[in-house]
Amino acid sequence: MGQTKSKIKSKYASYLSFIKILLKRGGVKVSTKNLIKLFQIIEQFCPWFPEQGTLDLKDWKRIGKELKQAGRKGNIIPLTVWNDWAIIKAALEPFQTEEDSVSVSDAPGSCIIDCNENTRKKSQKETEGLHCEYVAEPVMAQSTQNVDYNQLQEVIYPETLKLEGKGPELVGPSESKPRGTSPLPAGQVPVTLQPQKQVKENKTQPPVAYQYWPPAELQYRPPPESQYGYPGMPPAPQGRAPYPQPPTRRLNPTAPPSRQGSKLHEIIDKSRKEGDTEAWQFPVTLEPMPPGEGAQEGEPPTVEARYKSFSIKKLKDMKEGVKQYGPNSPYMRTLLDSIAHGHRLIPYDWEILAKSSLSPSQFLQFKTWWIDGVQEQVRRNRAANPPVNIDADQLLGIGQNWSTISQQALMQNEAIEQVRAICLRAWEKIQDPGSTCPSFNTVRQGSKEPYPDFVARLQDVAQKSIADEKARKVIVELMAYENANPECQSAIKPLKGKVPAGSDVISEYVKACDGIGGAMHKAMLMAQAITGVVLGGQVRTFGRKCYNCGQIGHLKKNCPVLNKQNITIQATTTGREPPDLCPRCKKGKHWASQCRSKFDKNGQPLSGNEQRGQPQAPQQTGAFPIQPFVPQGFQGQQPPLSQVFQGISQLPQYNNCPPPQAAVQQ
């Protein structure tokens, strides 16, 4: 909290001192603590309030309205804030050039009730010197015809006389009077605190116009008059904003304002109230110098480069954008492009933007790619015909000739454009911590992913991995078809290689894939499945088709066209007429080789292609082979048949198994 108070005190130091002097001279004492609290609330809910302060009563009325809105939303606004706000608003009323009045109704009703109760409790004597704790009446609401304006100005604006370096005799036409510590006479006191009825009576009194000269911190500083066509305006010192020096004459706020640059003033005032006091300035501005002696007509004017640093608001926006969205998010790219192309950025500006917005690791990446891009650009400059005289020191802002801001401000437009292109390219290559850049081959469209999202991912990866613009374009167009899902490929296939010259291929692909995945596309797929309608340049059929006629519903062996042609084809190939009756089945006019009947005309089953013989009897086999019995004396000779049968009858008769005794012997 202490740091916030010290920050507010240092930020509005000049304006706080002016307000305290103004209120003290009016007879109202406000502590510095309460003023700091007031400006804390103003900075919280009114970010457009300028640091140098304002003397415009409309601004303070706007502050009151916004504080009321904040109170309605549940924010707590202390009563001391309303008290100080009403006092300052009332004190600034006499300094307005229009008939503006301050109403006590702007303050909360509770403040007025408390003020009236305290007033009734005090005696009349005490009330004359009492300062209300809640609401102050309009400052200088009474008649101030007899007020010594010179003395009032000398007390309120002592710093102005010191800045001018002249005596108070230049303040007004009357003679100067020595300053005293005693207050003004009772009839000349410009501030009175009276009941609420007196406020309404004093509303009808016209405000008094003063001839004043506020301190230098509160002066309205317009752009240089050389922008309005006034020749001979001396240039501002190097390193400072292009503001003219404060005039030494007195200003009369009642005089009609000049119309020179009034539109520009309105734009600047609007930006100032919105909180961007540097909206109309650039880091480096080029202003035409007045023509010198001996200058010829048609000769290009000489320009002077002046540098202006970035505003804190702009750097803060960059830092918050990088932290919240990432350095290469669409928001940050758009913001960076607007800053880069809307300003004349020198290498020092790019380094300030990167250091204030990026983390140390990200800044190291940016610096590395910056140096790499500079080396590549220098090689191109040397290879150009004729060679471009821009070296690496100039593009990096280093070396003896380009290390200072004043030297970089004199860079040529071609060098500024090269620095811009190199730094934007280096910024695009920055990777978030913990993330890696995938290959463009691995970027594929999901089954339910919209085609524009897939193309955006593909372009982002290709932009980070492919440096050559032409090669990047060709690869993106190829991968936009190859890595798309089957549905998008079917829609893109008729357009592949047929996009007219001058048209963007990716845009045509996106148009062709518009609506895929929606209800209409699903209905078309269903109709396609039923009827086989052509969709996306392909005929999609479901089911089996005939390889002879190409129709769906039957196979080639059942094709009616083929069956009708078989007889004619065979007749022409064999050179003979078909028979009258099949010799095999006796019931059809076809050849016997083509007969497929299983029964003849009498119903008898037909064999295959030829007649079969009688079936053979099955052979019986035993466990042991039977050897024929041959009697002795007939080895090598054929024994008589009677003896063979006699030997067979003498063999033991047993079945497939040997007798038990033989099994035991074995």
From Swiss-Prot:
User: Which SUPFAM superfamilies does the protein's record reference?
Assistant: Retroviral matrix proteins (SSF47836), Retrovirus capsid dimerization domain-like (SSF47353), Retrovirus capsid protein, N-terminal core domain (SSF47943), Retrovirus zinc finger-like domains (SSF57756)
The answer to whether the entry has keyword Phosphoprotein is: no
| Chain spans, region Disordered | 165-264, 598-642
Instruction: Give the keywords, sorted.
Output: Cell membrane, ERV, Lipoprotein, Membrane, Metal-binding, Myristate, Repeat, Transposable element, Zinc, Zinc-finger
Lipid bilayer topology: Lipid-anchor
Principal localisation: membrane
Compositionally biased spans, kind Polar residues: 604-622
Protein name per Swiss-Prot or TrEMBL: Endogenous retrovirus group K member 6 Gag polyprotein
Q: Where is the signal peptide?
A: none
Q: How does the record describe the protein's post-translational processing?
A: Myristoylation is essential for retroviral assembly. Alteration of the glycine residue leads to a block in the budding of particles and an accumulation of Gag inside the cell.
Where are the annotated coiled coils located?
A: none
Residue intervals of every CCHC-type zinc finger in the record: 544-561, 580-597
Query: What is written about domains in the entry's comments?
Result: HERV-K Gag polyprotein contains regions homologous to the matrix (MA), capsid (CA) and nucleocapsid (NC) proteins from infectious retroviruses. Evidence suggests that HERV-K(HML-2) Gag polyprotein can be cleaved into mature MA, CA and NC under certain circumstances. However, the exact boundaries as well as the size of processed Gag proteins have not been precisely determined yet.
| A cellular-component GO term for this protein | plasma membrane
Protein localization: Cell membrane
What SMART domains does its record include? ZnF_C2HC
- Here the segments flagged for biased composition (Pro residues) are 232-247
The GO annotation for biological process reads:
viral translational frameshifting
Tell me one GO molecular function of this protein.
structural molecule activity
Q: Where is the lipid attached (N-myristoyl glycine)?
A: 2
Q: Which PROSITE patterns match?
A: ZF_CCHC
Low complexity bias locations: 624-640
Name the job this protein performs. The products of the Gag polyproteins of infectious retroviruses perform highly complex orchestrated tasks during the assembly, budding, maturation, and infection stages of the viral replication cycle. During viral assembly, the proteins form membrane associations and self-associations that ultimately result in budding of an immature virion from the infected cell. Gag precursors also function during viral assembly to selectively bind and package two plus strands of genomic RNA. Endogenous Gag proteins may have kept, lost or modified their original function during evolution.
| Organism name | Homo sapiens (Human)
Family affiliation: Belongs to the beta type-B retroviral Gag protein family. HERV class-II K(HML-2) gag subfamily.
